[in-house]
Amino acid sequence: MINVLQEKTYIKMNKCVLNFKNDLNKIRANRATPELLDNIFIDYYGTHTALSKLSNIIIENNSTLKISLFDISIKNSVEKSIINSNLGLNPISSDSNIRIKIPALTEQRRKDIVKIIKNDAENTRISIRNIRREANIQIKTLLKEKEINQDIEKQVKLEIQRYTNLFIKKINDILSIKEKELLTI
């Protein structure tokens, strides 16, 4: 029972960190990454479909993405979706491909993005602490129901606190790396 609780707590905390990391990967620095287009969807024969499912997206060079569509008939829809995505990207159409030149970030925009990711990091830390709180409540319930004794309660609470410290450190490390990446010209 306790092992399952510890394992579930670890898995939930790990998911929070992975989601945070995935969200940060979508935020661009001065490099073109295919993940930048992960949130672009196209209405493909009545189905809301991710661009990545309808094309190959490759890095052509440091500042250019190349989209090779599987179905050329959706090229106009893809271009409109990219323009309407509020990512500040302008697609350039050529034969069956679409190229996207990633514009350089201004210093002010970099600072704004850093503020946003710091806020996201804090929200992720709060989620980690809430998971810890939920686990501690479950531990107290088990103690009240006499399914565990006080020694086990203390051991498990310490272990969950170690998880909390570990994942908050991971969040801080990921944030630090992304912050340096964004502020480096």
From Swiss-Prot:
Coiled-coil region: none
Highest taxon of the lineage: Bacteria
Subcellular location: Cytoplasm
Organism lineage: Bacteria, Pseudomonadati, Pseudomonadota, Gammaproteobacteria, Enterobacterales
Stated name of the protein: Ribosome-recycling factor
Single Gene Ontology BP annotation: cytoplasmic translational termination
PANTHER family tied to this protein: MITOCHONDRIAL RIBOSOME RECYCLING FACTOR PSEUDO 1, RIBOSOME RECYCLING FACTOR
InterPro entries associated with the record: Ribosome_recyc_fac (IPR002661), Ribosome_recyc_fac_dom (IPR023584), RRF_sf (IPR036191)
Keyword Protein biosynthesis: yes
